[in-house]
Amino acid sequence: MATKAIDVSTHNGNIDFNKVKAAGVENVIIRCGFTGYGRSHTLNKDARFEENYKKAKEAGLNVGAYYFSVALTEADALREAAFVLSLLKGKQFELPIYYDVEDVHDTSAAGVLPQNMQGLSKAQLTAIVNRFCDTVEKAGYFVGIYSGKYWFRDEMDMSVLNRYTVWLAHWTTQTDYTGPYGLWQYTDSGKIDGVQGNVDMSYLYQDFAPIIKRLGLNGFTASETPSAPVILMGDVNGDGAVTEYDALLTLRRSAGLETFTEAQNKAADMDGDGKITAADAREILRKSAGPED
């Protein structure tokens, strides 16, 4: 069942997160920072990041973070990743850390960078996004990518980036995006008690918090509680259902980014060859979609 989420930054002003929660929102993704459009490529902390994080946690919301990128090279992405890690240090996030990829700034304006991310080739942009996400992931964070439908479809090679969870921006009543996604931002003009003016709103389809906590990611200490027995092929996390998240865990395991129990390995080995591969992840993803017509 989907739950409601909002994403906020300093532009949303002073937020009453207790009212936000009372209005039925369970999740908030907070901008931690952004890279400026100027030629100096300045890395900036969001002016309300600390305040928003503290208040959202006190209100009992699930919290994630995002960083708005203007990276034009892999070196830029590494610089942004190091900055983001410094902002996240000492904090705990129940939701992923998202790389916001949507830069289309006017390159003809005075004093700004003469190129934007949309002007990069698919291979260049994919390498940049992968460099940032891989760096933050290896530092112990559950990482995702935020972008629009057409960017995911046309600007990035998602066969390379498919191990990262997707936060899809598509402002419509029903998205026709065909790729997997865990979060869907469906409007930039939502109204919610506790936030003045419009606010971005999303539906969250994946229950990230238990997985992040169990694996000891995003500032949490790994749970010492044994994993529940896995009794269903493809049900890697033992929740009784085969979902896209099981496929994601299996893909991460195939890349050496997860450690599975014996039971999890058996559940993930869809072809029975004794190995956990991307092919197993694809089969679990297919199974999660339900019976074929």
Language model features with spans:
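Sec/Tat-exported extracytoplasmic proteins
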Residues: 24, 32, 57-60, 88, ...
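Short beta-strand/turn micro-motifs composed of small residues
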Residues: 67, 147, 170
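Aromatic-lined carbohydrate-recognition surfaces of secreted/lumenal glycan-active proteins
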Residues: 136-154
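Substrate-binding cleft of extracellular glycoside hydrolase catalytic domains
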Residues: 1-139
